[in-house]
């Protein structure tokens, strides 16, 4: 659990704009005296708003695998020091934190999946091709896997499959081949090196008509592979329902179609009643719905929010309530 340092200054987090903030508060519906889990604390924009909305007596367990994010979040949450319990953990490891606190259940849980604005904006973290930095992409700098190892050590077939699966990149084969050919003349060490290789792998007519930089999907794919982002989500969803109190709410914000698909299918599965085969004339399984889905379709940012925060453009929120 982290301490609350007093040498942190507000500018490190004051400009942070949490995505879909009003929608999170609406669907999480925090109440006084409740216990809440923020599995992806980031710079604590959502967490601080939850605590402000709920008032005294509310407690929040916050997790982040990135120690720098946790350091900054700790400063932002200093006014709520008696109400917060912060851990350097992956969100899939949330049960370790709840068990440490002696919390059998929580009244609400939030995860905001994907890379944070802070991580993108710090070139030395190696997430972005907008500024040069080491080819890293680890959300936890102490983790073993890195983008450098994938790019410089994996076979063509492995790179192709990663870029195709996680990036849904139609040029995955060409890009993987270009990476392997380039590293034959020396290691690929920086983000701009990799971005240039990917850009050259694209046919000129594709580059001329593309809305985004040609490296966008490849960088996304490598980041998701390095941090096992889909595996994290699956493991979290496997465990969270049992740790929600009756009436407890789960709110998930995702930025990628693969993640949103996983969340949608899992919530629909939880909301099913009878699971008997269709040919059985009468229910014999006795299964009843475990959740009530609160969002029939994903909630997205309003035009007003998009004007303030363009990075919210791909955010999708889904929510469910345990019955």
Curated annotation (Swiss-Prot):
Belongs to the methyltransferase superfamily. RsmH family. Coiled coil: none annotated. It comes from Nitratidesulfovibrio vulgaris (strain ATCC 29579 / DSM 644 / CCUG 34227 / NCIMB 8303 / VKM B-1760 / Hildenborough) (Desulfovibrio vulgaris). HAMAP family: 16SrRNA_methyltr_H. Specifically methylates the N4 position of cytidine in position 1402 (C1402) of 16S rRNA. The lineage of its organism: Bacteria, Pseudomonadati, Thermodesulfobacteriota, Desulfovibrionia, Desulfovibrionales. SUPFAM superfamilies: Putative methyltransferase TM0872, insert domain, S-adenosyl-L-methionine-dependent methyltransferases. GO terms for cellular component: cytoplasm. The gene is rsmH. This is Ribosomal RNA small subunit methyltransferase H.
